[in-house]
A protein has these predicted regions:
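N-terminal signal peptide c-region/cleavage motif recognized by signal peptidases
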Residues: 12-14
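Hinge/cleft segment of the Venus flytrap/periplasmic-binding protein
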Residues: 18-23, 297-353
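Hydrophobic alpha-helical segments within soluble ligand-binding/sensing domains
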Residues: 18-26, 137-148, 153-178, 282-303
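Extracytoplasmic "Venus flytrap"
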Residues: 20-22, 29-51, 59, 64-66, ...
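Hinge/beta->alpha junction and helix N-cap segments in small-molecule ligand-binding domains
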Residues: 44, 70-89, 156-162, 183-192, ...
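An alpha-beta-alpha
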Residues: 52, 153-203, 309-324
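Beta-alpha junction/loop-to-helix N-cap segments that form part of ligand/metal-binding clefts
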Residues: 75-140, 241-256
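Hydrophobic alpha-helical
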Residues: 107-122, 214-279
Length: 353
């Protein structure tokens, strides 16, 4: 109807009105509408979003030119926590998904597992293309496999083969085989800990985990795992929003505890953890960029999402903090030292093998 109305207006107007717009002006007309949905507002999600927008820009899709973005961040009440708060989040996600389905955008970006898992059914029924990012394991959000998400859905995942990641951990810390992990009911966190436990068994290592509430102080759980030197020999940080809440309080306390007790802290996700000696995992910004490349194909070429495989960072990033290693009196094996490169903020990047 809008096209017919425009045609009629042009026919009735003066001859000057039917002159074509300059190419530059046409390119700047809003062309694509993208909705973004996420739960909580944490730094890693912002990195993923920035990567996504960067990929669209690289494909000539840009806000103010031919892109409109509406971003919704569903709050999680960390102070209340618990079942009812989580149920409320699920309901909010579904309400937003219904609103988005009615708005009929060209594409939806879901950041994180909860937004993806609880919005996808509604968006699939409405035939609105869904691209996700910052998901630990696609299978946990309803995908058929790591690479196939079924009708109407594709995206990028933070998935890293946990056995390979722990092999790198063991190369840096060969004398530590008992790993402690503290997590919440965060879906990415639960999946990450389960994967770590399975990968550790294959390597003759062991993971002992403690679940806490998002409002809990982490220190009692650390003490229970450490058992005054009789328990775990290192701590590993899973992909859990808990560590990004309250200005990184849990992460800071974990780093301090590790320093006081000469226990290495490693993180199995590229999330800022003050005091961590080793980082192994996919980078949120890089994974967000991968999602953006898939979105560009859907928007520009009208490619169906199910045609596009789920992408992931093939070689995870490995960073070490040399100052923290020195404080722990740990020296890297010569084979790793020989292939290190200087990274930002004084870190060393190790070659992934």
């Amino acid at each position: 109807m809008k096209i017919l109305a425009l045609a009629a207006a042009l026919c009735c107007g003066p001859a000057l009105a039917i002159e074509p717009l300059p190419l530059e002006a046409m390119e700047q007309q809003p062309g694509f509408k993208v909705e973004v949905l996420q739960v909580t507002d944490i730094e890693p999600y912002q990195e993923a979003y920035a990567g996504f927008i960067g990929a669209l820009r690289a494909n000539q899709i840009e806000a103010g030119r031919n892109l409109r973005v509406n971003r919704v961040k569903v709050d999680f009440d960390a102070e209340r926590g618990g079942f009812w708060s989580k149920l409320g989040v699920v309901m909010r996600i579904r309400q937003e998904a219904q609103r988005i389905a009615a708005a009929r955008p060209d594409l939806v970006l879901a950041i994180g597992s909860p937004a993806t898992k609880y919005a996808r059914g509604i968006l699939e029924d409405a035939k609105v293309p869904l691209v996700f990012t910052a998901v630990a394991n696609p299978v946990d959000v309803g995908c058929v496999s790591l690479a196939d998400c079924g009708p109407g859905v594709t995206g990028s995942t933070l998935y890293t083969n946990m056995r390979d990641a722990l092999t790198m951990v063991h190369r840096v810390f060969p004398n530590a085989s008992r790993i402690g992990m503290v997590h919440t009911d965060d879906e990415n966190g639960v999946a990450n800990v389960a994967a770590a436990a399975g990968g550790a068994r294959e390597l003759g290592m062991a993971v002992t985990a403690r679940q806490v509430a998002k409002t809990d102080n982490i220190v009692p759980a650390l003490k229970a795992l450490h058992q005054q030197g009789e328990g775990v020999q290192m701590f590993a940080v899973p992909l859990d929003t808990y560590y990004g809440l309250h200005r990184y309080e849990a992460a800071i306390d974990l780093g301090d505890y590790g320093a006081e007790h000469k226990l290495p802290v490693v993180t199995l996700a590229m999330v800022r953890v003050p005091g961590a000696a080793l980082y192994v995992g996919a980078e949120f910004g890089a994974v967000g960029y991968l999602a953006g490349t898939q979105a560009a194909k859907i928007l520009k070429n009208h490619t169906k999402p199910e045609v596009l495989p789920v992408l992931r960072q093939e070689k995870p990033t490995v960073l070490v903090d040399p100052a923290r290693l020195a404080a722990l009196d740990i020296r890297l094996p010569e084979a790793l030292l020989a292939r290190r490169t200087q990274a930002r903020n004084g870190y060393w990047q190790l070659a992934w093998e």
